[in-house]
Structures are given as C-alpha cells and as structure tokens.
C-alpha cells in the first residue's frame, strides 16, 4: 500500500543552492562555475525573505555558509536536503530527465554564439527563405519578434534563434509564413539536429500575429522534441495505470512520454500555480503524481542576471506556497526542488552547475529533519518506491526517511 496517495513535484526552474563538487568542469563566459550559488548569492546581495519555505526547512539544508537571510528552523514542518547531478549537462532537459531517473552521459548541444552556418544554409535551401542572421543567437522570444518582426513582414525571412537550452526556435508571422509552412520547416530542422555536432532537445515553432509594436505570440506553438532514450519513472507509472499530470513545460521536456494528463503551458509562475492547485482539486485525481515546472526564475531573471527580479519571483512563490499546501489532502506529499542553478550574480548568462534544494512536506508527517544528501534521481526513485513501480536507470529512494 502506498505511503502517500498523491505526490506533487514542483520544480523551481534554476533555483540552485550552491556549487556542485564538479562545478569547475562547467563554465560561464570562460569562468568556471565553482563559485556559483544561486540562493546563497541572492540572499547575501539583495536579501531573501521566504518564511514559508524556511518553515519546511530551506535554511536547514547543509551548506559551507548558512543562507544569510533564511534562518534555520528549530522544528521544521518537513524534511530538507540538497541533491547533486551526475549527468554531463546543466540544461533543463538533462536536469528533468535525471530527476526522473536517467543518467545522461551525452549531453545535448547548446549554441551560445548561434547556430553554425551549415545548419542555417540547409534550412534556407529547404525552405526557399533567407534567415535573419542577426537573430541567430540566444534571444528572448518576445524581444526577438519585436526586434525582427517588422523586417520579416517586409522580406519574408525566417527568424531563427536559440536560448540557454538545447533548442532551435523559429518565429513566423502567421500572415507572412503560413502555419503549415512553418511546421514543415520545423520538421526539416528536427531531421537535421538529431546527432552531434547539433544534437538538440527541441525544435519549436513560434507563430505570432499583430503589427509592429504590438506583436502577440499565438497558441499555435508546436514542439518537435525527442523522447527520453529509456523509460523514466513517468513511463513506469503510466504503464502501471497510475495517473501522471504535467503542468507547464513538463510535457514538452518529456515529449509527452509517460504523461497521461497534460494540463497545458504556463503563462507565468502564478498561472502555473493556479493550474497546479486546480489539478490538485480534481475529483478524479485520487491517486497519482503531478509534475510542475515554474520557469520564470530562470527565463526572466536568471539568464538576464537580474538579482532583484529573481528575489521578488522567489518571494511571490513563497507567498503562494500556503495555497498549495491548503490544496493538499492528508495523504499527499509535496516535493519542491530545482533542475540546475542560474546564479544571477555570476559571470555570463548561462545556467550554473549547482546542488538543488529539496523540500518535502505532508500533512501526515509526524517527524521532521534532514534527509541525507543524495542525487537528482533519488526523487523519482522515491516516487517509484511509493507507488510500487520499478525505478529507472539510477536513484535511491528516501521514502523511508519521510515519517
């Protein structure tokens, strides 16, 4: 019999808690990640007040130096620890796939200087359209259409850009490049990015409408992803007939594999929390697993190195955490974690190789304290242990520690 009827996993995208032991093997603008510390540096430089996460035990997580403005609790309401990544990457897909039990020994490719000319020219030759070279770099999805949408409307050129993750995105005005044509071009781009030196996790069609100065991305986005190379714990749950709910970009990250209820993309963290609470309230969701990604920390503030915005975003989540807890049932387990770091005080604009925090709370807990420091995949091993399914490639359950 399951210890918990439902487990809700919430990933605070990029909220790392200090450099991992191998952080110096990863770099940002030529600077090794060894001094990165997302939560620590935010707390130290701009202050961090997250009393609800602190109550569960955020300030109790072992660190070389305590979080400056997040005190340890004498008697926390839950359990806490930090987890180390073993996979050879620090991107979103690698982090999430490892959380669900995979060891990624061949990381996806990212393109901080834009895609190589041979990929761009292949897409041009296939599509019969030129590509705007100035857009070919990591770019905000809204900024790139503001900057190059007017030119696309005049010339019909393609807007191709990337991000910190292993993705190639093509933005196209629906009145200039019809959806079916955009999708066909994306399918071709997918076909030429399936192996090194350009092994990409996703190709994303990003259609938009409107006039210069008032462009709006539409709901006709389409992702061309790759599925995990082996079954994850999501697949094990699905195969056992256990409900799996995805909130935010989780469905995209796993290409729908192992997910039987996709609750849609988030417009913002707040919208994602609304969707999670709605999901938790579904009468038919009696037993199973929900998996939520809240990306604003990373997308809006980490990459932009905006410490104040990142702090405020953490405050907003913490203020809404009681609503999530109120939506829990007696035999629910809430797990709050991250997928990598993105220290807004650090060099460069890329993710940082860090430990991730783990907070565990249930109304049924009679104990509290620290869980031994482990690895990302311990989360999925615990989920598997609870529901009586097999683990994936890696991971050790800490279910026995939650009492």
Curated annotation (Swiss-Prot):
Pathway: Carbohydrate degradation; 2-deoxy-D-ribose 1-phosphate degradation; D-glyceraldehyde 3-phosphate and acetaldehyde from 2-deoxy-alpha-D-ribose 1-phosphate: step 1/2. Keywords: Cytoplasm, Isomerase, Manganese, Metal-binding. One of its GO terms (biological process) is 5-phosphoribose 1-diphosphate biosynthetic process. Its main location: cytoplasm. Binds 2 manganese ions. Its EC number is 5.4.2.7. The keyword Zinc does not apply. Gene3D superfamilies: Alkaline Phosphatase, subunit A, Phosphopentomutase. The keyword ATP-binding does not apply. It is found in: Cytoplasm. One of its GO terms (molecular function) is magnesium ion binding. Its cofactor is Mn(2+). Mn(2+) 2 binds at residues 298, 303, 351. It is an enzyme of class 5 (isomerase). One of its GO terms (cellular component) is cytosol. It catalyses: 2-deoxy-alpha-D-ribose 1-phosphate = 2-deoxy-D-ribose 5-phosphate; alpha-D-ribose 1-phosphate = D-ribose 5-phosphate. Belongs to the phosphopentomutase family. HAMAP family: Phosphopentomut. Isomerase that catalyzes the conversion of deoxy-ribose 1-phosphate (dRib-1-P) and ribose 1-phosphate (Rib-1-P) to deoxy-ribose 5-phosphate (dRib-5-P) and ribose 5-phosphate (Rib-5-P), respectively. PANTHER family: PHOSPHOPENTOMUTASE (PTHR21110:SF0). This is Phosphopentomutase 1. It comes from Streptococcus agalactiae serotype Ia (strain ATCC 27591 / A909 / CDC SS700). The gene is deoB1.
